[in-house]
Amino acid sequence: MLLFCPGCGNGLIVEEGQRCHRFACNTCPYVHNITRKVTNRKYPKLKEVDDVLGGAAAWENVDSTAEPCPKCEHPRAYFMQLQTRSADEPMTTFYKCCNAQCGHRWRD
């Protein structure tokens, strides 16, 4: 937790005083004695994970192939190919199970 000096706006440091710890400013003579335990927790809001494959819309007009699903053993899967690495390496094939109850995704 970072507190700022009300006089000059610089960050306050914690130092030992004669009777207790205190917040003190290195620039001006401002001092604030700490009389109780000071805690403050803030949890950042996590943003939603972006679907790098474009979400559900990316799978609307793709072809299917005879690739069995490793999860439910359905005999067909939708597929698309994307260039995920440098141009001199082969494209990565992404699969999605054709079984609507499964929908498992994997890559080759």
Curated annotation (Swiss-Prot):
It is found in: Nucleus. It holds the Pfam family Zn_ribbon_TFIIS. A zinc finger (TFIIS-type) spans 65-107. The gene is Polr3k. Coiled coil: none annotated. Core component of RNA polymerase III (Pol III) which synthesizes small non-coding RNAs using the four ribonucleoside triphosphates as substrates. Can mediate Pol I proofreading of the nascent RNA transcript. Anchors into the Pol III active site to constantly monitor transcription fidelity, cleaves mis-incorporated 5'-ribonucleotides and restarts the transcription process. Once Pol III reaches the poly(dT) termination signal, can induce Pol III clamp opening and transcription termination. Zn(2+) 1 binds at residues 5, 8, 25, 28. It comes from Mus musculus (Mouse). A motif (Hairpin) lies at residues 88-89. Belongs to the archaeal RpoM/eukaryotic RPA12/RPB9/RPC11 RNA polymerase family. Zn(2+) 2 binds at residues 69, 72, 98, 102. The lineage of its organism: Eukaryota, Metazoa, Chordata, Craniata, Vertebrata. PANTHER family: DNA-DIRECTED RNA POLYMERASE, DNA-DIRECTED RNA POLYMERASE III SUBUNIT RPC10. This is DNA-directed RNA polymerase III subunit RPC10. Component of the RNA polymerase III complex consisting of 17 subunits: a ten-subunit horseshoe-shaped catalytic core composed of POLR3A/RPC1, POLR3B/RPC2, POLR1C/RPAC1, POLR1D/RPAC2, POLR3K/RPC10, POLR2E/RPABC1, POLR2F/RPABC2, POLR2H/RPABC3, POLR2K/RPABC4 and POLR2L/RPABC5; a mobile stalk composed of two subunits POLR3H/RPC8 and CRCP/RPC9, protruding from the core and functioning primarily in transcription initiation; and additional subunits homologous to general transcription factors of the RNA polymerase II machinery, POLR3C/RPC3-POLR3F/RPC6-POLR3G/RPC7 heterotrimer required for transcription initiation and POLR3D/RPC4-POLR3E/RPC5 heterodimer involved in both transcription initiation and termination. The TFIIS-type zinc-binding beta-ribbon domain contains an acidic hairpin motif (residues Asp-88, Glu-89) that likely coordinates the nucleophilic water and magnesium to cleave the scissile phosphodiester bond and release the mis-incorporated 5'-ribonucleotides. GO terms for cellular component: DNA-directed RNA polymerase complex; nucleus. A zinc finger (C4-type) spans 5-28.
